[in-house]
Structures are given as C-alpha cells and as structure tokens.
C-alpha cells in the first residue's frame, strides 16, 4: 500500500460529499404543503381528484388534446406550464394561445401560474400527464403516478421529434 499511496487514483480521500436531488428536499417541506392547500382553496376545486397536465414543451396543441380527452371526466384539470425565458417566445405564444382558447370554458379547468413551483402542483394532484418532462420523476417523490404521452412532438430539433421516455 505504501508504494501505491502516492498515486492519486488509489489514495483514499476523506471528506464530506453531498448527494441527492435538491428538489427532493421540498417533498416534506411544510411550506409546499401549506402553499398547495392555499392554492386549492383559492382555485376552489370542484372535484376531489385532480389530473395535472405539465409538459416540457407546449407544441402542436397538446393542451387542447389533453383537455378534450379529460374534460368529460369528473376530475379537476390542472394546467401547469413551464416558465420559459423570452428566448423561447414561440413556446410562450403557444402557451398563451392555448390558455386563451380554453380558460373560462370549462368549470373543472384550473391554470396554475407558470411562476408557481412545480412541487406545489405535484402536491395538489393525483396523477400527472406529460411528454418527457422530469416532472414525471419528481411526481414519484410524491407517490403520484404519471402518464407519458409518447406520440406528442417535441420541438427541440428540426423537424420536431417524438417524445422519449424515460427522459
């Protein structure tokens, strides 16, 4: 051992290393639960069960597809879009267009502000519908199942590609 100890690859180091997923710290945070309860009250949800639509990308009227499929069910439809920077104005425009098209037309449709934490939305829902978003992995931390829709197009390439699960 003494002959090899000077080689950096075999010399053990002592130290403290932090591991984990920073968002997992919020799962048991009472502030997230309190905020979710506050938002539930504020939105005055109609039903006991909530389905969260939280895609990576809003593209090709996916929100419209989701709403048409879920609206007839006796569930709350929660929409939580990602908070995009101005560099992605086309995506922001898609989000705004979908909201303008649907908001106020369904008594079981609720929009969660893009600046709200996704963790709050996950605490509020019973199931998640998404494309290839990491939100599906984050939902597991809340013991919430996810449905990955794999035939939705993702516009991060030219031409747009099909979503890929796992992420």
Model-derived regions: residue spans:
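Short, well-ordered beta-strand core segments
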Residues: 1, 128-129, 146
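Catalytic binding pocket for nucleotide-activated donors in carbohydrate/polymer assembly enzymes
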Residues: 10-13, 18, 134-167
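Short beta-alpha junction loops
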Residues: 1, 81-86, 151-154
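Conserved catalytic-core segment of nucleotide-activated headgroup transferases in glycan assembly
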Residues: 18-98
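Short, aromatic/basic amphipathic alpha-helical patches
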Residues: 5-10, 68, 90-102, 159
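Short, conserved active-site loop motifs that form the nucleotide-linked donor/cofactor pocket
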Residues: 16, 75, 107-110, 164-165
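Donor nucleotide-activated moiety binding/catalytic core segment of transferases
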Residues: 90-137
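Active-site and donor-binding regions of nucleotide-sugar-utilizing enzymes
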Residues: 1-31, 136
């Amino acid at each position: 051992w003494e002959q090899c100890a000077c080689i950096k690859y075999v010399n053990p180091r002592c130290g403290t290393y932090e591991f984990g997923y920073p968002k997992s710290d919020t799962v048991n945070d009472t502030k997230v639960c309190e905020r979710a309860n506050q938002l539930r009250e504020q939105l005055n949800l109609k039903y006991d069960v909530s389905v969260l639509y939280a895609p990576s990308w809003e593209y090709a009227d996916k929100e419209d597809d989701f709403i048409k499929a879920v609206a007839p069910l006796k569930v709350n439809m929660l929409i939580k879009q990602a908070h995009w920077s101005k560099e992605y104005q086309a995506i922001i425009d898609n989000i705004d267009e979908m909201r303008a098209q649907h908001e106020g037309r369904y008594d079981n449709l609720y929009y969660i502000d893009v600046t709200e934490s996704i963790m709050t939305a996950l605490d509020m829902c019973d199931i998640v519908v998404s494309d290839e978003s990491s939100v599906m992995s984050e939902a597991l931390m809340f013991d919430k199942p996810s449905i990955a829709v794999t035939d939705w197009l993702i516009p991060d390439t030219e031409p747009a590609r099909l979503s890929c699960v796992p992420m």
